Design a protein with these regions (language model features):
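Beta-strand-turn-beta hairpins that frame and shape the catalytic cleft
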Residues: 1-10, 144-153, 176
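Short polar catalytic/cofactor-binding loops
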Residues: 14-21
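Cys-nucleophile CN-hydrolase/nitrilase-fold catalytic domain and related Cys-dependent amidase chemistry
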Residues: 25-117, 185-198, 202
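Short hydrophobic-aromatic micro-motifs
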Residues: 46, 150-156, 178, 208
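CN hydrolase (nitrilase-like) catalytic-core segments centered on the catalytic cysteine
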Residues: 76, 81-94, 161-251
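Active-site catalytic loop in hydrolytic enzyme cores
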Residues: 103-172, 185-195, 251-268
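C-terminal beta-strand edge segments of enzyme domains
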Residues: 213-297
Length: 297
């Protein structure tokens, strides 16, 4: 049976950067294979985690003698990105390729998620940085983009924990937030996923999360734990569906979560104005554009 109109098949993947490969090219091909396999299995969009590409670090070190963030960024730009653009050109398919250090024209380094859709490329930089990311500079733009009839945004790890950022998306009709993440503790996994669920309620949208797992020869991502997760709005239009789908939490290897999105429940929810729904308050009623003082009693 043909799926209903305006559906989207998601493949959420954790990723273990400790790949047994011999070169930067082999590492890139392994990532390409994971994405193409997801597409071949029916996914319209594949989501990989934050710092997927920091597993390049030991290969960059052997090749150029050092592996600073800038070195990794240059290796990705010169060796990985051209190969990715050559191979990932499939129409009607999209992927968020995790994140990688990326050089700015001014010489800074940003934590960047590359996105491919229908063979075209765009990116999202991380906007809020952890204490461990002192070598990066924060991004300054949150991009909205569309694919398959759905409006999307990529919000990276700590950014999902900042409700002030989700405030910027009120009244935007965002349908899906994609959150690549990396954390070394179970508490970090819980924090990211609980906030992802909250963003789903606040904005009335779907939120998908993919965490990094495993070990890597890297000071930045030496140990990782995580899972794949998906959250829906807690509204009547979604009552026949689970509000959360989560894989098991793992410390290594790849876990998989396949999810089908349908546009109809989102559209129905947005028409149900008599239902209590924080997503329908808009910026003015939510107290963003009107002054609500805080008083101490």
């Amino acid at each position: 049976m043909k799926p209903p109109a305006e559906t989207l098949e998601l493949a959420l993947r954790t990723f273990d950067p400790g790949l047994n490969v011999a070169s930067i090219r082999e590492y890139t091909l392994a990532v390409i294979q994971m994405i193409e396999a997801g597409w071949d299995e029916g996914a319209d969009l594949v989501l990989l985690p934050e710092f997927t590409w920091m597993g390049l670090e030991p290969h960059v070190l052997r090749q150029v003698g050092s592996a600073t963030l800038a070195d990794v960024a240059q290796a990705f730009d010169s060796e990985c990105l051209p190969l990715l653009k050559e191979r990932l050109q499939r129409q009607g398919r999209a992927a968020v390729l995790g994140t990688v250090p990326s050089l700015t024209p001014e010489g800074g380094v940003r934590n960047r998620a590359w996105i491919v859709r229908d063979g075209g490329w765009l990116f999202q930089d991380k906007l809020h940085l952890t204490p461990w990311e002192s070598g990066f500079e924060a991004g300054d733009v949150l991009r909205l983009w569309s694919f398959g009839g759905f409006r999307m945004a990529v919000i990276i790890c700590l950014d999902i924990e900042v409700p002030e950022l989700s405030v910027r998306l009120r009244d935007s009709d965002v349908d899906l937030i994609l959150c690549p993440s990396a954390t070394e503790t179970l508490r970090g996994v819980e924090r990211v996923n609980r906030c992802a669920s909250a963003r789903s309620v606040e904005l009335g949208c779907h939120v998908a999360v993919s965490h990094l797992t495993g070990r890597a020869e890297s000071e930045l991502i030496d140990e990782n734990i995580g899972r794949a997760a998906f959250y829906r709005p807690s509204q009547a239009a979604f009552k026949a569906l689970p509000f959360a789908e989560e894989s098991e939490t793992v410390t290594s290897g790849v876990t998989r979560l396949e999810v089908r999105l349908e546009k109809r429940p989102l559209d129905l929810m947005r028409r149900m104005t008599a239902e209590t729904n924080p997503a329908l308050l808009g910026k003015e009623l939510a107290g963003i554009q009107r002054h609500i003082p805080v008083e101490c009693a």
